């Protein structure tokens, strides 16, 4: 089934991968190589995923994302808001070519309210090709091309105002 829903992630001004020119206070967050879910969990008591949309879309319905992924007749889209202690911290959008969803990766269709990072970083076969940073107005964003068992998926994350990325003095979880 195809869908025409609008993305929760609006236009992002992407920076060069080679020279992201990031302020030091946000570089550590945006260039995080590990799980953002795990990183966020060090700054809150509870992470909840608010699933906004998931489903297949046709190739022509993708925006600039189609240039970053292999051509596929359909792509699985998953859009979420990651909330920490009941505050929205991150918008996430995952784009997965249909061929990536074969074998064990078929489980990506059934994550529901499970954070994507919990699934991805439990795999021994996960590799990140790159991280690209950008801005959506005053908000910082990043996108990563990941390879799960040598099969690609694109993850875009927009850090919302309550995110610890913007709270430079908040370093650890509150007691």
UniProtKB/Swiss-Prot annotation:
It catalyses: chorismate = 4-hydroxybenzoate + pyruvate. Substrate binds at residues 36, 78, 116, 157. The keyword Chloroplast does not apply. Gene3D superfamilies: Chorismate lyase-like. It comes from the Bacteria. The keyword Transmembrane does not apply. Its EC number is 4.1.3.40. It is found in: Cytoplasm. Pathway: Cofactor biosynthesis; ubiquinone biosynthesis. Disulfide bonds: none annotated. Keywords: Cytoplasm, Lyase, Pyruvate, Ubiquinone biosynthesis. Pfam families: Chor_lyase. Monomer. Removes the pyruvyl group from chorismate, with concomitant aromatization of the ring, to provide 4-hydroxybenzoate (4HB) for the ubiquinone pathway. Belongs to the UbiC family. NCBIfam families: PRK11655.1. This is Chorismate pyruvate-lyase. It comes from Hamiltonella defensa subsp. Acyrthosiphon pisum (strain 5AT). The gene is ubiC.
């Amino acid at each position: 089934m195809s869908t025409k829903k609008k993305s929760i992630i609006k236009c992002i001004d992407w920076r060069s991968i080679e020279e992201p020119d990031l302020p030091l206070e946000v570089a550590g967050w945006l260039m995080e190589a590990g799980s953002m879910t795990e990183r966020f969990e060090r700054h809150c008591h509870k992470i909840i995923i608010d699933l906004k949309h998931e489903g297949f879309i046709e190739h022509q319905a993708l925006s600039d994302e189609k240039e970053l992924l292999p051509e596929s007749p359909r792509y699985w889209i998953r859009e979420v808001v990651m909330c920490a202690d009941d505050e929205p911290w991150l918008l996430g959008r995952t784009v997965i070519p249909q061929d990536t969803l074969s074998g064990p990766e078929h489980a990506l269709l059934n994550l529901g309210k499970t954070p994507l990072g919990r699934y991805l970083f439990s795999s021994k076969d996960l590799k990140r090709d790159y991280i690209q940073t950008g801005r959506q107005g005053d908000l910082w964003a990043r996108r990563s091309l990941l390879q799960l068992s040598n099969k690609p998926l694109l993850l875009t994350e927009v850090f919302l105002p309550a995110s610890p990325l913007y709270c430079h003095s908040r370093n650890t979880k509150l007691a």
